[in-house]
């Protein structure tokens, strides 16, 4: 009970700070590079399946996203796939040149698991062409003075492991992921000093195993009749458990074998929106706290305490929530050097009666999460229906993590908004500039209060394959002409970042 009250107290403190800080800002903040700490890192981010292409080249094996998008095009909004994507596999030097031209300090990219290990696991052999590609990318970045931030897993589980034992549904994946991470550390760790084990494990769990709208597309039939298999009441928790253990094992390998010589840092990139109470009632405040427990805290709490959030323990009925052994708990506690925060949008949370039928991870918190209150959206909508713009949420999440989870070192590892694809080359993205200005100001506010934020990565450097939305929306600072040889055109927002970042060099 004490833990529940502590969580609610932290939540209320952040809400109170929100009210105080809300009075400080006008609509569009003016930013300077000097508003941020001298060592603050600015970068841009991508992921392997979304930008690389070359899906069937140089020995790469298929991932679950190749299968999901190529075999079932009806599951993608525009029927497309990432087989060519932004073609960064062939155009990586041009992309590094764009990063350098804009003035970014760092580049966050992910490594394609099946490009390194195309045949199940380590026993199937390492694909040297994959090693060579990432060595070339890393070396090109360093030659331009750009720090590589590498993500080991960004949703693209090898299809061979999905076939062998169900991917992250199988306990075997923990050791296979550990071995894959070991290969990455061994081959790239002499130059890569910032690692993220996983990107958004929450999205993997929610969209891949509850909603069924992302690979591998599993869910309960009552949630999505297009799912051919799955169980939204049990599978998400099994997958989440294995993701957490895989992270822990990878960090353990790094610390035991590589940290002393390579002197790098290992973290994880976690996503969550901020959840505001739907009303001022105590019930809705508790519902908002539960919504946080089942999203950000779900993956953060085990890394701090070695346990699941108490709200999850209390609300996931019927023995569906796995438990950590004493040995696993010890391994997980403190298994991060920094926490990546991916933020796009926020929601309201309203207390609702707990369901005893058609139960899933979504219903377990007994909280209805919605982007509207009394018919009014929490903020303006971007191109995607889920992306309602609420800049204060990024500050509130940073402060929440600071006060609840021992003041961790944090990076904003993704932040951005999209516009709809029109078929025309449109480089005037003033709405994106406003989005970044608003959110960066909120990050600066959080730092001024004491949040230990060390950097910010824009999503994304390039227009790319946006998962179930395909190419119907664009998140890039750089326009990619998918009908014209993947030619790149910097948008107005890229020039805005260049002006912001070049101030440092002038001074």
Swiss-Prot record:
It comes from the Eukaryota. GO terms for cellular component: Golgi apparatus. It holds the Pfam family Glyco_hydro_1. The keyword S-adenosyl-L-methionine does not apply. Belongs to the glycosyl hydrolase 1 family. Residues 1-22 form the signal peptide. GO terms for biological process: carbohydrate metabolic process. It is an enzyme of class 3 (hydrolase). GO terms for molecular function: beta-glucosidase activity. Transmembrane segments: none annotated. Glycans are attached at residues 81, 226, 358. This is Beta-glucosidase 12. The active site is at residues 200, 414. Its EC number is 3.2.1.21. A beta-D-glucoside binds at residues 50, 154, 199-200, 344, 414, 459, 466-467, 475. InterPro entries: Glyco_hydro_1 (IPR001360), Glyco_hydro_1_N_CS (IPR033132), Glycoside_hydrolase_SF (IPR017853). Disulfide bonds join 219-227. It catalyses: Hydrolysis of terminal, non-reducing beta-D-glucosyl residues with release of beta-D-glucose. Keywords: Disulfide bond, Glycoprotein, Glycosidase, Hydrolase, Signal.
């Amino acid at each position: 009970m004490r833990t529940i009250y502590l969580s609610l107290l932290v939540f209320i403190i952040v809400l109170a700070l929100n009210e105080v800080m809300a009075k400080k800002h006008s609509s569009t903040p003016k930013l300077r590079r000097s508003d941020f700490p001298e060592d603050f890192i600015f970068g841009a981010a991508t992921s392997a399946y979304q930008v690389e292409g070359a899906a069937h080249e140089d020995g790469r094996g298929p991932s679950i996203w190749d299968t999901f998008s190529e075999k079932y095009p009806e599951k993608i909004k525009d029927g497309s796939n990432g087989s060519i994507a932004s073609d960064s596999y062939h155009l990586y030097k041009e992309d590094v040149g764009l990063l350098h031209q804009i003035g970014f300090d760092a580049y966050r990219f992910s490594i394609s698991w099946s490009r390194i290990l195309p045949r199940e696991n380590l026993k199937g052999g390492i694909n040297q062409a994959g090693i060579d590609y990432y060595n070339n990318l890393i070396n090109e970045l360093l030659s331009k003075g750009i720090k590589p931030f590498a993500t080991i897993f960004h949703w693209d589980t090898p299809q061979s492991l999905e076939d062998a034992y169900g991917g992250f549904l199988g306990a075997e994946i923990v050791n296979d992921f550990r071995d894959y991470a070991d290969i990455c550390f061994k081959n790239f760790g002499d130059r890569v000093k910032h690692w993220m084990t996983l990107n958004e494990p929450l999205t993997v769990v929610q969209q891949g195993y509850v909603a069924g709208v992302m690979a591998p597309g599993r869910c309960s039939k009552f949630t999505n009749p297009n799912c051919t298999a799955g169980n939204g009441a049990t599978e998400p928790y099994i997958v989440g458990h294995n993701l957490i253990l895989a992270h822990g094992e990878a960090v353990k390998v790094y610390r035991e074998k590589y940290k002393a010589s390579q002197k790098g840092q290992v973290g994880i990139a976690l996503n969550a929106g901020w959840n505001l109470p739907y009303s001022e009632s105590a019930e809705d405040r508790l519902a908002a706290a539960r919504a946080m427990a089942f999203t950000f805290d779900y993956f953060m709490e085990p890394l701090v305490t070695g346990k699941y959030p108490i709200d999850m323990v209390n609300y996931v009925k019927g023995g569906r929530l796995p438990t950590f052994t004493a040995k696993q708990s010890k391994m997980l506690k403190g298994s991060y050097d920094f926490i990546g925060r991916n933020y796009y949008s926020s929601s309201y949370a309203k207390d609702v009666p707990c369901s005893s039928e058609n139960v899933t991870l979504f219903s377990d918190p007994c909280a209805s999460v919605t982007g509207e209150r009394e018919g009014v959206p929490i903020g303006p909508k971007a191109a995607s229906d889920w992306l309602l713009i609420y800049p204060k949420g990024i500050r509130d999440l940073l402060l929440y993590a600071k006060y609840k989870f021992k003041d961790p070192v944090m990076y904003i590892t993704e932040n951005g908004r999209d516009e709809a694809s029109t078929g025309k080359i449109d480089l005037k993205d003033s709405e994106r500039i406003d989005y970044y200005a608003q959110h960066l100001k909120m990050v600066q506010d959080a730092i001024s209060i004491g949040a230990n934020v060390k950097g910010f990565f824009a999503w994304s450097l390039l227009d790319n394959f946006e998962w179930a939305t395909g190419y119907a929306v664009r998140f890039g600072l750089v326009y990619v002409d998918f009908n014209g040889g993947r030619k790149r055109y910097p948008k107005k927002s890229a020039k805005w970042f260049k002006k912001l970042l070049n101030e440092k060099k002038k001074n």
